[in-house]
Amino acid sequence: MSFTSRSLLASFTGCLLYGTPAIADNGSEPVSPENGIVFPLQTDAVNSCEVPDKKSKEEEDQQPVLIQADSVEASNNSKAVYKGNVHIIKGRQEIKADSITLHQQENIAIAEGNVDYSSMEMRTTSDKVTTNLSTEDTTMVNTAYKMSCQPIRGQAGRVLKTGQEIYQLEDASFTTCPADDNSWRFKASDIELDQSDEWATFYNARFEVLDVPIFYLPYVTVPVGDTRKTGVLIPSIGLDSKNGFELSVPIYWNIAPNYDATTTINYMERRGTQLETEFRYLTELGKGTVDAEYLNEDDKFKDKGSRWGVSWDHSGIYQQHWKFDVEYSKVSDIDYFQDLNSSIGTRDEGQLQQSGEVSYRSQDWDMTMRVRDFQVLVEEQTPYRLMPQIEFNYYAPQFYSEFDFNLHSHISKFTTDDKAKPSATRVHLEPKLSLPLSGTWWSLIPETSLLYTYYQQDFDKQPVGPNGSLNLDHEVSRTIPEVRINGAIYLDSTHKFLGEYLQTLEPKIQYLYVPEVDQSNIYGGTGDGGYDSSKLQLDYYGLFRDRQYSGVDYIADANQFSVGATSRFYDDAYKERMNISFGQILYLNGSGTEQNNDDKNSSAWAMESDFNYDDYLFYHGGIQYDSNVSELQVANSTLEYRFSKGYIQANYRYVSKNYIESNVNFEDDLSLITQHGIYQAGLLSEYNLGRNWALKGQYFHDTKEDQMIEALVGVTYLSDCWSFGLTYSDQLIAPESAKTIGTYEPEYESNLMLSIAIRGLGNNTGITSGSANNALDYGRPFYLNN
């Protein structure tokens, strides 16, 4: 008897037992005796990851049992034994085996010998499989398994499938590595794989690397998807030259659909045990995160006592009109970020903001109430607290003909702990009238404003007035008009630059007039700081501002023209490939900067440029050159070459000491920070060595002092199921006592970081340590359109 004849006979017996044809012609798939049986349900559907809905499941339950085998033995219409290349499909279950016994009354199939079992969630090879074809309850013996929808595989002495999507594995292993790769795996007495919750739970588990046990856990859960579930996550291990051996055990809390938290127990060999908690929430008032860190006793710095940090970030919109924002951070001491790695901040933090805002926004107006304070992380600095500020803005576009009107106003209360500084209440009103005009190739916006400010200034212990220490008035009001006219032209060239680039020219001019008003009876009213004012950087885009200072404590007088132009170059696809902008302010009555008694006729030249050649060579540069004193004030330049395996970037930053002194208010001696200004060169690169290896390097150097600022080198290995990283870094640290730059030997903090991560277990889980991130890092300061 031929093979095809035996298969037909076995299938015919299945029809007698189950009353449904096992051979079917669906109208599009012809039955060919030479090719054997054609099943209506193909193997691709059996192996689908799609979870059937209730209706689909009911339809599958009504589908016939499709059987193919070399031979069959039937017994009393109650069971049949199929032998030789047995193949069964029922709904989304598929079984291939040397022999299968079908029990009609119980609807149970017992497969033995080289059993391949496939369902919607799992594919296995076993010695024996017993399955209920109706309920899909299944037992497998001596099984190698692979999940269909996740990169998970392993072996198990016994597999039990209960319900539709839950598997229980006994004496089992678990890994996300590809076949024949046991770089890492879990071995456990019991593993529960819940496909609906997308989590795996291990009991009496040990973690092995290259078959070597690393650690034992009596209980642990890991995600096999993105679904959240409470449980102990995979521990983190690392090696840090600052903290020694590190072990972190995270515990995830799925509190509610819109609340969760992760508590991490961090053991640091040289520091002690730290508790770290991240709480996340989502409500109708917005979303936010609360982070808290606590180290009861720092073994390395015992004199600093318990060390802690906390932060709260919130942002949300309520009923389309209300907006809430909170940014609050606080740490136990000013050296916290220097001594400890933290998720709250980095070692280059100079202060932590503590602010909150509540806003109501309508079509024509908005109102905001805000409070703001700072924790200063340097000694002997006491910034002002804003307690509180109420801001009101009104907008009336085209309120009369083509004229626009808007009103900006606020009332602010400033307090400070510095007894040498006044506290104050400030009221500011600023109505503005403008006439925006434009055509296809031009725009012109004349506008006029009136700035009215009232102050009530108080000293806690010193009188304010003509005899006060700062010669300030207790009450003072100031009214300053402002006129501003801004115009621009947009021109396209009819000839292509270099035969392939469309060039545009965009000249721009602005006239600004602000009369000179004596403001010396206001704290900060001479341009040397104030309650919330500081001088703004005068780059190209700053040439066309109407203010030299943030805040309103000092309004610099102005009678000036700002002139500039931008030229852009586009390729045939209208992608911007290059631009260059340059400009200058021409002063008619001096610069208005009372601080320097300036009587010069022009500002420094400002220029910005960006370049993109064929999407692999990028450049950005900017300079400010003061021709009045023949001094380069500010310069920055970045050149980056990108290729298929990585990039290399060189950058340089220069700021003259005179520019720093003129634009930044230092309460301390500037020589403690710099003797000559900023002369900083950097070189950064990443390179992929083949498919798995990557190298990373960073180096920053002070070219004036001829000393390294920071350096970092790292290597990373990335495979299909795990990654390894080793990073070494050196960072220049400030001296413990106040010393003038250049009078002491530089000191560096060295860190060696080891990181190991396993892949394929959801988005947020892995064995990993922290990274040796430096204060200076890679950036892409390229601003071309498209």
Swiss-Prot record:
InterPro entries xref list: LipoPS_assembly_LptD, LptD, LptD_C, OstA-like_N
Gene: lptD
Secretion signal span: 1-24
Subunit structure, interactors included: Component of the lipopolysaccharide transport and assembly complex. Interacts with LptE and LptA.
GO cellular component: cell outer membrane; transporter complex
Organism: Aliivibrio fischeri (strain ATCC 700601 / ES114) (Vibrio fischeri)
Keyword Membrane: yes
Family: Belongs to the LptD family.
Highest taxon, organism lineage: Bacteria
Keyword Membrane applies: yes
Gene Ontology annotations of biological process type: Gram-negative-bacterium-type cell outer membrane assembly; lipopolysaccharide transport
Name of this chain's protein: LPS-assembly protein LptD
Main location: membrane
Keyword line: Cell outer membrane, Membrane, Signal
Pfam families the UniProt entry points to: LptD, LptD_N
Function per UniProt: Together with LptE, is involved in the assembly of lipopolysaccharide (LPS) at the surface of the outer membrane.
Places the protein is found: Cell outer membrane
